[in-house]
Amino acid sequence: MKAAVVEQFKKPLQVKEVEKPKISYGEVLVRIKACGVCHTDLHAAHGDWPVKPKLPLIPGHEGVGVIEEVGPGVTHLKVGDRVGIPWLYSACGHCDYCLSGQETLCERQQNAGYSVDGGYAEYCRAAADYVVKIPDNLSFEEAAPIFCAGVTTYKALKVTGAKPGEWVAIYGIGGLGHVAVQYAKAMGLNVVAVDLGDEKLELAKQLGADLVVNPKHDDAAQWIKEKVGGVHATVVTAVSKAAFESAYKSIRRGGACVLVGLPPEEIPIPIFDTVLNGVKIIGSIVGTRKDLQEALQFAAEGKVKTIVEVQPLENINDVFDRMLKGQINGRVVLKVD
């Protein structure tokens, strides 16, 4: 089968023929139709996270397609089902985290496109219990980004605790941020979009953002405080230390700062202000299978629409270059089939 493979860190991916995966008990073989491109894939290819993936590696954790083969022990899925393979490739199923609905914190989890091969290929093996079905009225290209960008931001907004009518600031209007704006509006929240790109802020306005601010032109935190008295919550998708610092300063008393993006730096937090103002700082990592089902339902009902640019698998290195330069609006989806 054809696949895009990381053979050396920080080197171009090789699009080549590799062996088609074989499945075993509890697994399914998915014929990949499309796969979204996430910033995490870039980290996997560069090997710049503390825990590096083993090479060679096929990246991709937004792979969607059709089940072509069902392994022994699988009774809830059949050949022909439309499914996606999320970042949470599998978890142990019996630790405290798995049993309490926090499976994304499982210490024995496997991750698609990082610890196991992912969706930058014509075929992908998957743990049957962790694939999620795609609603019939969503195309593969529309559905793919929901499997990471969508569920990640939807879950992050849930954990803010923000209520309808309250204000939330979305820092970074890229692959995650553009769907975060839509989920926030669908949840009844007022939205401030923050980004360094005017074209991305224009997209945010088209998607329903109530206010937009560019930190190149204004101190975003001060501007937000002047306009709305501070936000009840922030969701930071930008891979930028400055964005996290600004997001913290933009929160009103009792608010929540939810961290999603993963910049390499450490961020100093003023303990006195955090305690005195009752500010909550929360890390949020993707979402559970249930979160993913809910996120897909918003898209199926037309309340969230991913903005996608379709590219052939062979263009992956060009896509990575553009991603590094911040030149992508919405999400790039690789057409694999």
Curated annotation (Swiss-Prot):
<dbReference type="InterPro" id="IPR002328">
    <property type="entry name" value="ADH_Zn_CS"/>
</dbReference>
<dbReference type="InterPro" id="IPR013149">
    <property type="entry name" value="ADH-like_C"/>
</dbReference>
<feature type="binding site">
    <location>
        <position position="331"/>
    </location>
    <ligand>
        <name>NAD(+)</name>
    </ligand>
</feature>
<comment type="similarity">
    <text>Belongs to the zinc-containing alcohol dehydrogenase family.</text>
</comment>
<comment type="function">
    <text>NAD(+)-dependent alcohol dehydrogenase.</text>
</comment>
<keyword id="KW-0862">Zinc</keyword>
<dbReference type="GO" id="GO:0008270">
    <property type="term" value="F:zinc ion binding"/>
</dbReference>
<feature type="binding site">
    <location>
        <position position="195"/>
    </location>
    <ligand>
        <name>NAD(+)</name>
    </ligand>
</feature>
<feature type="binding site">
    <location>
        <position position="61"/>
    </location>
    <ligand>
        <name>Zn(2+) 1</name>
    </ligand>
</feature>
<dbReference type="InterPro" id="IPR020843">
    <property type="entry name" value="PKS_ER"/>
</dbReference>
<feature type="binding site">
    <location>
        <position position="106"/>
    </location>
    <ligand>
        <name>Zn(2+) 2</name>
    </ligand>
</feature>
<dbReference type="Pfam" id="PF08240">
    <property type="entry name" value="ADH_N"/>
</dbReference>
<dbReference type="InterPro" id="IPR036291">
    <property type="entry name" value="NAD(P)-bd_dom_sf"/>
</dbReference>
<protein>
    <recommendedName>
        <fullName>Alcohol dehydrogenase</fullName>
        <ecNumber>1.1.1.1</ecNumber>
    </recommendedName>
</protein>
<keyword id="KW-0560">Oxidoreductase</keyword>
<feature type="binding site">
    <location>
        <begin position="172"/>
        <end position="177"/>
    </location>
    <ligand>
        <name>NAD(+)</name>
    </ligand>
</feature>
<feature type="binding site">
    <location>
        <position position="148"/>
    </location>
    <ligand>
        <name>Zn(2+) 1</name>
    </ligand>
</feature>
<keyword id="KW-0520">NAD</keyword>
<dbReference type="InterPro" id="IPR013154">
    <property type="entry name" value="ADH-like_N"/>
</dbReference>
<dbReference type="GO" id="GO:0004022">
    <property type="term" value="F:alcohol dehydrogenase (NAD+) activity"/>
</dbReference>
<feature type="binding site">
    <location>
        <begin position="260"/>
        <end position="262"/>
    </location>
    <ligand>
        <name>NAD(+)</name>
    </ligand>
</feature>
<dbReference type="Pfam" id="PF00107">
    <property type="entry name" value="ADH_zinc_N"/>
</dbReference>
<feature type="binding site">
    <location>
        <position position="95"/>
    </location>
    <ligand>
        <name>Zn(2+) 2</name>
    </ligand>
</feature>
<keyword id="KW-0479">Metal-binding</keyword>
<feature type="binding site">
    <location>
        <position position="92"/>
    </location>
    <ligand>
        <name>Zn(2+) 2</name>
    </ligand>
</feature>
<feature type="binding site">
    <location>
        <position position="38"/>
    </location>
    <ligand>
        <name>Zn(2+) 1</name>
    </ligand>
</feature>
<feature type="binding site">
    <location>
        <position position="98"/>
    </location>
    <ligand>
        <name>Zn(2+) 2</name>
    </ligand>
</feature>
<dbReference type="InterPro" id="IPR011032">
    <property type="entry name" value="GroES-like_sf"/>
</dbReference>
<feature type="binding site">
    <location>
        <position position="200"/>
    </location>
    <ligand>
        <name>NAD(+)</name>
    </ligand>
</feature>
